[in-house]
C-alpha cells in the first residue's frame, strides 16, 4: 500500500496539500537522478509471497487478523485487502551465488510458521493465483480487512467509479458477474519479484521487462478458474483490470487509461516519465500526512522517503511497476514484476523468478535497447495472448518472427536466461535446478493452469463443481507441503478432500446455472416441446425485464397441453396462464440443507435461485441432490 497510515482524500485542502508534496517528490527525484544519488555498487533481488487462508472444507477463511496476532513477532508477515489473504515480504538478497535457494528457504520457513499458526486456528494455507473455491458472496465488505487504508482504498475507488463493477471474461466458459465493491480484486494472489536496477540502465531494463512479460507468463500460468468457470490461462490479468477499473463509460470513450495497465508505449528517458504520466492520467486515490522536508534531507545527504510519490504509485497497478526505495540508508530504483501468480509451489515460484531475472540481465547484455527490434504494440499483444492461452499460443520475438511459446522458451530464452544468471555469478547448481524446472514444465506443457483444468475436467465427470474445486484445492495444499514442482503432480482425486461435507455447501456452489427459460407469452405447446428436447422437467418463466415471475413444470405443461389440444379455441394457451406464479425461491448464499428442507417440506422438484433484484441466476433440482448423494455413497464404499 506504499505507507501504513493512508486515508481517503475527503477535502480539497487535503488534496492540495498532498499534490504539493507529490510535486516536491518529483522535483527531488529529478535532482537525485541528475546528481547520481543512487546506490550502484550492489544489485539486490526481492519477493512478495501472497497466500490464501482456507477452512477445513477448503473454502476462504477470514482469519488474517488472528493469524497476525499469532505471528506478531515476525516482521515479514502482513495483511492483504481481504481477510482470507496474507503476504510474506522476503528479505532482499544480493543477486549472486546462492541468492535463489536462500530466498526459497526463507519463504518455506516462514510458510511453515504460518502453517503452524493456521493449524492452531483450525485453518490451512494455500498458494494459488486464484483460489478455486471462491464464491461470489466471499467478496462482501464483511471480508474486508478492517484497517483504515483498505477502507480508504475501496471508498476512493467506489467514489471514482460511481457504479457497480461488471466482470466479463470469456474462455472455455463465460463469466458475467456484477459486484458492488472492488474487493473482488482480492481474488488475485501473486508472487511479485523485485530487481534493483542502476539508474543509467533503468530505461532499457524496464522496456526489457515489458518484452519478456509474455513468455515468462506463458510458462507460469496458474489461475484458470474463477467461480467454477474455466476462463483465461491466467485469469488474474483480466480480473485485476476489471475489478479496479475506475472509469465510467464516457471515460472509456475518451480513451482514459485503466489503473491496471501494461502501458501504452516504450519508456524513453528515465523513470520520471512513468511517475509523471501516472500523475497526469490517474486521480489521487489516497493521501498521507507527509512530515519530511525532502530538500532539507537532500542537503544533508540523507535519502528522502518520497512518501507522497510512493502512496500514489501504490494506487496505479502497472504489471511492471517502477519503484523507488531505500536500502541500508541508500536510495535505489527497482522493477517489480507483478505478472506472476502465487504457486503452484515455492519451487515453481523461485524457478519463475530465476527465469525472469536471468532474462532481464541476459537480454540487456545481448540486445541492449529492445525498442530497436520490436514495436510496443507487439509486446502488449504478446502479453494479452499469453494471459489468455498460456503456452498454447504463438509469440513474436525480437527477430520479428513468430514462434510457438514453448519453442521460443526452450530454444531461445532459456539459454539467454542461463547466461544472465551466470553474469551475476549465481551458482551453477542453482541455475541448473531452477531453469531445469522451467524447461521440464514447458516441454511437458504442465503448468499450474494445465493441471487445474485437467483435474477439473476429470473430476466433474463424476462430481459436482463444488466438490471438484474442493478436491483441487486439497490436492494443491498436499503437493505444496512436498514442494514438488507442478509438472510432476498427479491429477487431483476426489479422495483428497477428506473433510468434504455436503451440509457445508452453499446453494451457489451446487445449483445448475445452465437454466432454460421462457416468457409468459410463449405458448404451452412450444415450451412443452422445449422441455422434451432438453429432457428437463422445470422451466423458469421471466418477464420482459428479466425478473422471475413463474415456474413451469412438465406435469403442468402436459396436463394443460392435453386438455387444450382437444379444444378449438382460436388463441393458443400461453405459459402465463398455467405456470406457478411467484414461486418460492432461495438465495445463492443459503446452505444446501436449507434448500433441501424447503423442497422436502413443500414437495418441490425445483427451486429457483435469485439475487436481491429477483434476477434468476440458477436452479436447484432433484438431480443436484442425486449427484451429491451418489458421491457420498461412493465415499462410503
Provide a role label for each language-model segment.
Residues 1-499:
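Phosphate/nucleotide-binding catalytic core
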Residues 130-131, 434, 544, 559, ...:
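Residue-level "edge-of-site" marker
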Residues 325, 365, 533, 563-567:
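Conserved helix-loop functional segments at active or binding sites
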Residues 468-471, 523, 527, 531, ...:
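Amphipathic alpha-helical coiled-coil segments that mediate homodimerization
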Residues 492-514, 528, 553-602, 612, ...:
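Tandem CBS (Bateman) regulatory domains
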Residues 518-520, 537-551, 586-588, 605-619:
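Cytosolic beta-strand hydrophobic patch enriched in CBS
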Amino acid at each position: 500500500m506504499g505507507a501504513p497510515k493512508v486515508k481517503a482524500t475527503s477535502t480539497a485542502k487535503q488534496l492540495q496539500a498532498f499534490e504539493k508534496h507529490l510535486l516536491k517528490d518529483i522535483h527531488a527525484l529529478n535532482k537525485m537522478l541528475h546528481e547520481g544519488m543512487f546506490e550502484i555498487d550492489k544489485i539486490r533481488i526481492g519477493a512478495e509471497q501472497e497466500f490464501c487462508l482456507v477452512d477445513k472444507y477448503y473454502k476462504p477463511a477470514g482469519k488474517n487478523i488472528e493469524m497476525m496476532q499469532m505471528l506478531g513477532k515476525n516482521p515479514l508477515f502482513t495483511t492483504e485487502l481481504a481477510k482470507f489473504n496474507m503476504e510474506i515480504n522476503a528479505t532482499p538478497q544480493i543477486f549472486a551465488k546462492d541468492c535463489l535457494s536462500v530466498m526459497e528457504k526463507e519463504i518455506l520457513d516462514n510458510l511453515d510458521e504460518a502453517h503452524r499458526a493456521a493449524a492452531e486456528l483450525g485453518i490451512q494455507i494455500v498458494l494459488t493465483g486464484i483460489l478455486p473455491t471462491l464464491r461470489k458472496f466471499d467478496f462482501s465488505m464483511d471480508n474486508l480487512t478492517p484497517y483504515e487504508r483498505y477502507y480508504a482504498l475501496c471508498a476512493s475507488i467506489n467514489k471514482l467509479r460511481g457504479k457497480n463493477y461488471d466482470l466479463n471474461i470469456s474462455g472455455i466458459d463465460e463469466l458475467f458477474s456484477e459486484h458492488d465493491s472492488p474487493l473482488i480484486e482480492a481474488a488475485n494472489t501473486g508472487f511479485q519479484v523485485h530487481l534493483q536496477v542502476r539508474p543509467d540502465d533503468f530505461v532499457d531494463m524496464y522496456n526489457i521487462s515489458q518484452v519478456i512479460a509474455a513468455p515468462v507468463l506463458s510458462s507460469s500460468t496458474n489461475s484458470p478458474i474463477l467461480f467454477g468457470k474455466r476462463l483465461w490461462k491466467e485469469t488474474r490479468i483480466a480480473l485485476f483490470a476489471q475489478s479496479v477499473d475506475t472509469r465510467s463509460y464516457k471515460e472509456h470513450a475518451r480513451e482514459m487509461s485503466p489503473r491496471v495497465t501494461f502501458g501504452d508505449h516504450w519508456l524513453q528517458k528515465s523513470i520520471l516519465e512513468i511517475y509523471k504520466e501516472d500523475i497526469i492520467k490517474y486521480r489521487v486515490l489516497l493521501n498521507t500526512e507527509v512530515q519530511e522536508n525532502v530538500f532539507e534531507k537532500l542537503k544533508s545527504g540523507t535519502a528522502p522517503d518520497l512518501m507522497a510519490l510512493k502512496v500514489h504509485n501504490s494506487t496505479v497497478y502497472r504489471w511492471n511497476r517502477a519503484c523507488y526505495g531505500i536500502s541500508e540508508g541508500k536510495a535505489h530504483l527497482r522493477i517489480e514484476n507483478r505478472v506472476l501468480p502465487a504457486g503452484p509451489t515455492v519451487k515453481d515460484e523461485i524457478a519463475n523468478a530465476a527465469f525472469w531475472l536471468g532474462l532481464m540481465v541476459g537480454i540487456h547484455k545481448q540486445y541492449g535497447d529492445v525498442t530497436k527490434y520490436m514495436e510496443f504494440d507487439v509486446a502488449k499483444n504478446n502479453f494479452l495472448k499469453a494471459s489468455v492461452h498460456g503456452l498454447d499460443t504463438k509469440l513474436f520475438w525480437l527477430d520479428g518472427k513468430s514462434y510457438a511459446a514453448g519453442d521460443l522458451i526452450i530454444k531461445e530464452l532459456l539459454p539467454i536466461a542461463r547466461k544472465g544468471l551466470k553474469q551475476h555469478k549465481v551458482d551453477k547448481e542453482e541455475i541448473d535446478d531452477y531453469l531445469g524446472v522451467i524447461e521440464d514444465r514447458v516441454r511437458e506443457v504442465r503448468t499450474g493452469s494445465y493441471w487445474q483444468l485437467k483435474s477439473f475436467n476429470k473430476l466433474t465427470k463424476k462430481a459436482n463443481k463444488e466438490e471438484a474445486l474442493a478436491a483441487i484445492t486439497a490436492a494443491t495444499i498436499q503437493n505444496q507441503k512436498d514442494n514438488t514442482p507442478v509438472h510432476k503432480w498427479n491429477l487431483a482425486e476426489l479422495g483428497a478432500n477428506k473433510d468434504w461435507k455436503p451440509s457445508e455447501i452453499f446453494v451457489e456452489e451446487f445449483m445448475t446455472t445452465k437454466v432454460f427459460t421462457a416468457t409468459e407469452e410463449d405458448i404451452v405447446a412450444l415450451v412443452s416441446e422445449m422441455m422434451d428436447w432438453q429432457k428437463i422437467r422445470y422451466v423458469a418463466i421471466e418477464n420482459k425485464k428479466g425478473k422471475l415471475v413463474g415456474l413451469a413444470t412438465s406435469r403442468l405443461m402436459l396436463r394443460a397441453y392435453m386438455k387444450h389440444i382437444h379444444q378449438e379455441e382460436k388463441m393458443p394457451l400461453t405459459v402465463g396462464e398455467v405456470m406457478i406464479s411467484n414461486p418460492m425461491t432461495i438465495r445463492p448464499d443459503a446452505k444446501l440443507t436449507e434448500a433441501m428442507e424447503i423442497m422436502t417440506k413443500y414437495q418441490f422438484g425445483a427451486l429457483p435461485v435469485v439475487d436481491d433484484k429477483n434476477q434468476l441466476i440458477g436452479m436447484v433440482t432433484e438431480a443436484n441432490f442425486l449427484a451429491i448423494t451418489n458421491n457420498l455413497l461412493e465415499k462410503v464404499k
